[in-house]
């Protein structure tokens, strides 16, 4: 319930703070709420309250976060008139955006769904662990690089010459950080898996090919990230929706063909082939 209320009442404020370079407001609030709610939940469980009351406490703490964000926006954006008639023309590509989102949903979940349907749970477990580790690395990169995205968006819509210079610097910085972290991941991941899986015999977690495939997949994904941002800044969703659909189709088709022959390697190769197409065509 808190997620639905958050989306409907706080979503617009979150976007406003993001494009104004104040994402740290929502990030700090979310961090405090997360820690506070966990402490309260632990306290309630230790004192014998049932699960309904524990979840209700989480709901109440999240409501306090929404109230705080709303008050912050009203105080620092007093000029903002929420009673103005919405400009629906600005949302003329909403259907195209939905196509992108659905296509992205299919693309991002093809691997795990195909493995769940056509492989055993041990294979899914190995894939999920590798994916979790690489996702943590991706979160670090995003945390370091996403804080300046709003500057790029503002420059794109106000000063194209300045944007081109800024984009070149940002792309170099972004790719450099990405390659550094994924290179370290490629080197350290096998050793981590040997330590993690010590004593585990039901599944083979140590694999010489999986680190390379996972890192290759993510390097390709991050190599196109800066170009994809330009599409978002320019609002060219309709012009690129077919390419997004083709990318998902390639991933799904190749994964379904290869999963029966080489298992987990097959779905990863399918994703890599789709990324090769989209990275060159973006």
Name every feature range the model reports, one short phrase each.
Residues 43-48, 105-136, 151-155, 190-202:
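Helix-terminus/linker motif at the lipid-water interface of multi-pass membrane proteins
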Residues 3-11, 65, 101-110, 128-151, ...:
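Small-residue-rich midsections of specific transmembrane alpha-helices
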Residues 3-28, 52, 216-246, 282:
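Membrane-interface junctions at transmembrane-helix termini in multi-pass inner-membrane proteins
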Residues 51-52, 89-93, 97, 115-135, ...:
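Interfacial/gating helices of multi-pass transporter permease domains
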Residues 1, 188-219, 225, 265:
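Interfacial segments at transmembrane-helix termini and the short loops linking adjacent helices
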Residues 18-19, 134-171, 227-233:
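Helix-loop junctions and terminal segments of transmembrane helices
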Residues 27-75, 89-93, 100, 131-134, ...:
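Hydrophobic alpha-helical transmembrane segments
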Residues 51-58, 67-109, 113, 151-165, ...:
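Interhelical loop/hinge segments that connect adjacent transmembrane helices in multipass membrane
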């Amino acid at each position: 319930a808190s997620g639905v209320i958050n989306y409907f009442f706080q979503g617009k404020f979150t976007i406003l703070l993001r494009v104004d370079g104040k994402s740290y407001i929502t990030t700090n609030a979310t961090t405090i709420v997360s820690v506070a709610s966990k402490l309260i939940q632990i306290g309630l469980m230790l004192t014998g309250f049932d699960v309904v009351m524990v979840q209700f406490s989480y709901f109440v703490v999240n409501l306090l976060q929404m109230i705080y964000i709303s008050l912050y926006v009203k105080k620092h954006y007093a000029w903002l008139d929420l009673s103005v008639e919405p400009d629906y023309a600005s949302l003329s590509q909403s259907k195209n955006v939905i196509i992108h989102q659905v296509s992205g949903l299919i693309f991002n979940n093809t691997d795990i769904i195909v493995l769940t349907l056509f492989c055993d749970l041990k294979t899914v477990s190995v894939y999920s662990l590798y994916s979790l580790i690489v996702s943590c690395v991706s979160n670090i990169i995003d945390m370091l690089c996403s804080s300046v995205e709003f500057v790029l968006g503002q420059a794109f819509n106000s000063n194209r010459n300045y944007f081109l210079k800024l984009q070149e610097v940002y792309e170099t910085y972004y790719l450099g950080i990405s390659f550094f972290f994924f290179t370290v991941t490629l080197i350290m991941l096998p050793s981590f898996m040997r330590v993690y899986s010590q004593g585990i015999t039901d599944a083979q977690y140590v694999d010489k090919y999986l680190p390379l495939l996972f890192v290759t997949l993510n390097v390709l994904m991050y190599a196109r990230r800066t170009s994809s941002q330009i599409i978002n800044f320019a609002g060219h969703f309709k012009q690129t929706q077919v390419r997004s659909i083709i990318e998902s189709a390639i991933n799904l088709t190749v994964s379904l063909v290869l999963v029966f022959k080489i298992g987990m390697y097959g779905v990863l190769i399918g994703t890599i082939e789709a990324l090769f197409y989209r990275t060159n065509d973006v």
